[in-house]
Amino acid sequence: MKWKEQAVILGVRQYGETSVILEIITRERGRYMGVVKGGRSRRMAALLQPGNFVEAEWSARLEEHLGLFRLEALDFHAARLICLPEALYALQLIAFHLRLLPERDPHPVLYDILHLFMQNFDEPFVNAELLVRFEMRLLEELGFGLDLSCCAATGRKQKLYYVSPKSGRAVCEEAGEPWKKKLLILPQFLVQRATRPADFRDIINGFNLTSFFLMRYVWEPRDIKQPSVRTNLIQLFERRFGIQAFIC
C-alpha cells in the first residue's frame, strides 16, 4: 500500500530510540499517523514541527498497518508561528478539535479551512474568523450542525440576529426581541456574504456561540473540559479586540 499527498503536520511523539510517530492531516485521507525513521535526529527536527506543510508519502504492507512516512518540505510555517502567539494557540486548538474525529476519516472542508488559516496566520482578525468557521463546521461534521438558513419562528431569511440555545436554529430580530436575553447572538459574518472583515464583536460572539454548542454536544458528553489552549486564545483575542467573551 502506498499513497502521496500534501499535508499539515499536527504533532509528533517519540517511537523507539531514533524514530517518531508523526501525525498529519491531509485533504483526501484525513488525519493519519505513521513512523518516521530517524525522526529524532537533529537533521529532521526543523521539518517535524507542527504547522509545517509537507508532501507526505505513506507506505505499508497492509492498509491497517501504522506504516512509514517519507516527507518533503513544502513550507516551514512553524518557524514563523513561534513569533505569533494567537496563531500558535489556534493551530494547537485546531489539532485538538481534529483529534475528536476518527483517524483516517477525510474531512476536506475542515482541511481547506486549516489550509486557508495557514496562509493567513499573521492576520489575527482573519484567523479568528476562520477559527469560528472551523468550529462551526466541526459541529456539522460531528452531526450537530446549526440551522442558520431561516428563522425558526417565522421562516424569514432576513435579519437573522439570534440562535436558539434549545434548537440550534436561527431566530430573526423581530421574533427574538422579547426573548433576546435567553438567546445567543448570531455573528453576521456567518449568514451574510462577506463584504468586509468581521468586526471584533462579531468574532467574540462567534466564539460564544461555538462554545455553547461544543460544550453541550461534544465536550460534556465525552467528559472533556474546554481546552485550556482555547481559553488562552480567546483571552489573547479579548486583549487585542478590547471585548470580553462569555466562556461556557
From Swiss-Prot:
Per the UniProt entry, what are the Gene Ontology biological process annotations, in alphabetical order? DNA recombination; double-strand break repair
UniProt name for this protein: DNA repair protein RecO
Functional summary from the UniProt entry:
Involved in DNA repair and RecF pathway recombination.
InterPro entries attached to this UniProt entry:
ARFGAP/RecO, DNA_rep/recomb_RecO_N, NA-bd_OB-fold, RecO, RecO_C
- Protein family (similarity comment): Belongs to the RecO family.
Tree of life domain: Bacteria
Keywords (alphabetical) are: DNA damage, DNA recombination, DNA repair
Instruction: Provide the species name.
Output: Bartonella tribocorum (strain CIP 105476 / IBS 506)
Sorted alphabetically, which Pfam families does this protein's record hold? RecO_C, RecO_N
Cellular component GO terms, alphabetical: bacterial nucleoid
